[in-house]
Amino acid sequence: MCGIAGIATQHAGSIAIEKLAHMAAAIQHRGPDGYGFYTGLHVGFAHVRLSIVDVAGGAQPLTNEDGQIVITYNGEVYNHVELRRQLESRGHVFRTRCDTEVLVHAYEEWGADMLSRLNGQFAFAISDSRDQSVFIARDRFGVRPLFFTVQRGSMYFASELKALLASGDIKAVVDPQALDEVFTFWATRPPRSGLSGIQALEPGTYGLWRDGRLRIHRYYELDFPEREVEPRDAIEQLDELMRMGVDLRMRADVPVGAYLSGGLDSSITATLAAAASPHTLRSFSITFDDPRLDESAHQRDAARAIGSMHSIATIGGNAIAECFPEVIWHAETPLIRTAPAPMFHLARLTKNAGIKVVLTGEGADELFLGYDLFKEVAVRRFCLRRPDSTMRPRLFDRLYPYLLDNGSGGEFWRRFFLEAGAPGDPLFSHLPRFQVTSWIKQFYSADFAAGLSGIDVVEELRQSLPTRFFRWSTLNQSAFLEMTLLLSPYLLSSQGDRMAMAHGVEGRFPFLDHRLFEFAAALPTGSRLRGLKEKEILRRWARRILPAAASARPKQPYRAPDVPSFFAPKAPEYIADALSGASIQATGVFSPTAVAGLVRRCRSGLATGFRENQALVAVLSTQLWHDQFVARPVYPRMLDIAGADVVLQDAIPVS
């Protein structure tokens, strides 16, 4: 895993390598093991490397034999060994063992059609001097980030926004609608990025830059074509796909570890990883000094069962508050939860243990309907059909005991979930979340709210739904929304890629093997969610490899301390400054008066509810984000060009 950046232009002359060195410096955390540059006619690439496959021979940018095709690449193609054999049988000659070179030859052989053959997580750019084009692409589920902007006849692209801004050519301007999306959906909807004029390349798409224009094309679409399948056959297929997915993701020339929360999904991936590893598996987890959030006992039990060497990062005191500015710097977006902060600490623990690659369980909840949200859909539909049922309160209590008992008002929340949307609304499953999150908007300043007049991000989402969406069951519609609104732009990004790569750690996700997704998406929903029992088929299969208690353990939502983290004794000084009336006024997103009231309630302990927690985190993170990227951005000094592993000019190696 690495970081990439580049510029393609229709203007005469080559790209200044110094500009590329500035862009690369801004993302060097993604690739601490080396860096390189390419400057050709109308194009320039930068690359920072995290060496995992072919450690000695995988420096980038990399060319084909005659230098006409050049690539800068972030990610992993797990089936590169099989693709290499196919390409060699067609006459291609390889100089390295790295998957990067496989992409170069795959592009030569198949062009854009290569993407359907790749099993991996990737974002890359390929310069083709034969037709003066640049080809950019992103993996099916958006595991790896890629941003771009087209300005004044040039296309700029990079793994992170800060690399684009570090070029010196692009000004950071707040996109108000993007922030409104964060405060509705938890994240921006691709292609928005948070900054006006800069877009995220959407998952499952590629772009072709030629003649001063960038054209975006889709090569992969999520689909849920339910088919009947014999339960025994389904279990056997699941067994094969899970083992293949993990085995492929164990391919590396460095040790591979695993994140192990103690839950079902991470226990599965870690167990299979331990079986496939030639060495004792290193596993890692986080816990909290708050006993209500402490799952360390389950984590240790899981590690003992697997036989892994386990390390735990305990998060307490001011740990979240102290790292929060760094978290925002790497996330590059306002947040409404502190959940990425413990993941930042977890990645640091992993790096300090000498591990660069970890397998994790992300994707299982979306594929196998593991979230409470999916059960909530079933409960809400039942309660709307049976308004007089005495089971209604008990069903909600079973779903959200922590929400109903934390001072938020249990009866209020029961009424709220019942009144949030009609079953015929295509967004029925997610409207409660949207409405709870949108509570933040009452703190908008008058000017910011006025700038959003006439914009309804929820209605825009409704209008954007694909035709096939309306053929699916309600639960599959819910899964689609969860994957497109939360998995890629938040869980795999702010909480995933950004926190891991802040410390040069690569996360790999066996549940996001596209073959496993396509299998799970075609299963009847009843085999994934039976009554209120989530992940039914996954649990049945897991009995083969996990202790009975682990395979039966109910889903535990990942929660991190929020408001108390920022008002503990000896809290960092930046908090008071960021939340001061003068700072709030200068940023302009929120009302100083409204925020002052929220801060007083939070500081006094009167505001302990879910919504107040979200609002405080939203305000503080927005203040930090605006300061770091808009008001007072500071970028690292440019990388030393003479120290590069490779410098290519006009596709001819010169050093």
What are the residue ranges of the model-derived segments?
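A mobile, often basic/glycine-rich helix-loop segment
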Residues: 366-397
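Cysteine-centered catalytic environments shared across enzyme families
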Residues: 1-332, 343, 543-544, 549, ...
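Short acidic/histidine-rich active-site segments
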Residues: 355-371
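Adenosyl-5′-phosphate
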Residues: 1, 113, 166, 175, ...
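Short secondary-structure boundary/capping segments
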Residues: 327-328, 372-379, 634-637
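Acceptor-substrate binding/catalytic loop of class I
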Residues: 334-337
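Short aromatic-enriched loop/helix-cap "lid" or pocket-rim segments at secondary-structure transitions
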Residues: 296-297, 324-325, 370-374, 564-565
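Short catalytic/ligand-binding loop motif for oxyanion handling, primarily in non-cytosolic enzymes
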Residues: 133-135, 144-145, 165, 269, ...
